[in-house]
Amino acid sequence: MDNKLEKMKELVEELNQYAYEYYVLDNPSISDKEYDLKYDELVILEKKTEVTLPYSPTQRVGDKILGEFSKYTHKGRLWSLDKAQNMEQLIEWHNRNLKVIEQYNSMSEDKLPELRYIVTKKFDGLTVNCTYDENGILIKSATRGTGIIGEDITAQIKTIKTVPLKIKNSYVIEVHGEAIMTKTAFEEYNKAAQVPLKNLRNGAAGALRNLDIKETARRNLSAFFYDVGYNEGPEFKSYREMMNFIRNMGLPQDKYIKECTNMEEVEKEIEYIESIRGELDYDIDGAVIVVDDIKTREILGYTIKFPKWAIAYKFEAKEITTKLLDVEWNVGRSGRVTPTALLEPVELGGVTVKRATLNNMDDIKRKNVKLGAKVLVRRSNDVIPEIMGVVEESLEESEEIQAPDRCPYCNSHLVQNGVHYYCENTLSCKPQMVKSIVHFASREAMNIAGFSEKTAEQLFEKLDIKSIADLYKIKKEELLTLEKFKDKKSQNLIDAIQNSKNCDLASFIYALGIPNVGKKTANDLVMKFKTLESIKNTTIEQLVEVPDVGEIVAKSIYDFFEDEKIISNIEELLNLGVKPYYEEERIDENPFMDKTIVVTGSLNNYSRGEIKDKLQSLGAKVSSSVSKNTDYVLVGEKPGSKYEKAIELGVKVINEEEFSNKIK
């Protein structure tokens, strides 16, 4: 037993070091295959010994659903930062600091040093506090909360691969950081999500406040650490020293840290950060300027809310205040009834905004949003604007938003499930049926060419199409009665419907509209179970073994195929001649098979999604970062830092023309 435990400790130390090299340093020393072999060996030993070390990498898997969030009292307070909107306000802050230091030095023999500032980026994510004990083990992680009391998110933080579960430290510390979702992770998640995320910040916040840990893991969060908020070890003399300590502990840290001795230098760095803002793989909303010397910080002190020795310079945000005129309730394909805010039109980021997202009634109540009130609207990453909060002073003459009790379209009684309201009238509720038909016919589903929402509406209203199976019963002469349907268009649609009967199984599964199942999950299900019959009869336990399928998604799939009406509809589709098929994909030998490839820059003949699909069809592994284990970097126009990293590491670089020649 002792030998096995020693071997486990050895494997855990090795695997954590390899993970640090891979995720933090971006410079792995072993191959993925070697890592997987050691990881599998550790899993076997943990099962045999029934012992799992608290800092074992197997604790990152995230395969449980928690009951609720518990409170955690921070050992050291998490302060908010005062904000400057322009250089004049920043200079005022600087002059106040100078005045306090001059007064102190005039009365004290122990002089404070020349004022020196450290400038860093201000990340637009969710503040987190991680506690490591005297053995260096991560024992607690929590949200900021009030700054004094937060919520325990330890299990969620452990899914972030860059956050070490153990550090080489012998006293209790709390480190503050920002959990973020990168643009790369955001795009990857949305490819497979039935309900796409709206922006990076919500992606991170929603992941950390999700009780389904596997869903948190799916979002592939990252983190940057920038402060030691509580420390039972030797005191730091400067912020530089503190940041070096954080880095030496193996905690992920942004490389950009600049020292400035005057406001001209600070302004130059702020301008630089703003200039690279759009190139970053994550969101920032400003710069943070802090006093470097710790003793000077102590002399400057705090207000009730903020430290006087730090300030955030906020970039011009894509946010604005306007009036909430009304709330419109819309019905989606799943029957979910969701609110949309109707706003007094306002210009935001070069666009006239009239509507904004309100996720559900819980969201409305939490943000205290009311009719007639002034609301703060944010537009991130060019997606649908979202209401972030309300102007408190505008609430006096406002009205409460009432949740509907009937469907706004078919007048059926709504049922509440969790935070959402649903219309269960799937047969005659127009928005549900129309959106279901459009989804079924879409390119990634059954690929019925020439099918639009307008066509679906006519089929529902004039041809009484009440189920997906009814599509395969439509006759040409019926289509000729519809608006703008002549002979050729009618025949083309009939042909397209008939041609769709021979479809691949993954497209059919996706077309069925299973809640929480996107095209990627549909593909993964087919890869795992091979046949429609197997997928229909699988268990929740088997479903969670599918990559990226957690308890919630597994239950959605299981419940879907338990519904007798759905099974009846599927049987009717099969009886009408729909024949989903699955063929094991065979990949011909090619130069990119089993190679790791990174893509950077814009390509002429492929979008980012298309080139990824193409490479994967060639048997290649597509990575988002360059390391010495990368085989090729495919470079397009205006490549980013990945190109420079490839040159630095001596990785083979090819352009689009060379790529095309290699696959001819």
Curated annotation (Swiss-Prot):
Which CDD domains does UniProt cross-reference here? BRCT_DNA_ligase_like, H3TH_FEN1-XPG-like, LIGANc
Highest taxon in the source lineage = Bacteria
What biological-process terms (Gene Ontology) are attached?
A: DNA repair; DNA replication
The terms describing its cellular component in GO are: cytosol
Q: Which reaction does it catalyse?
A: NAD(+) + (deoxyribonucleotide)n-3'-hydroxyl + 5'-phospho-(deoxyribonucleotide)m = (deoxyribonucleotide)n+m + AMP + beta-nicotinamide D-nucleotide
Which family does this protein fall into?
Answer: Belongs to the NAD-dependent DNA ligase family. LigA subfamily.
* Protein name (database record): DNA ligase
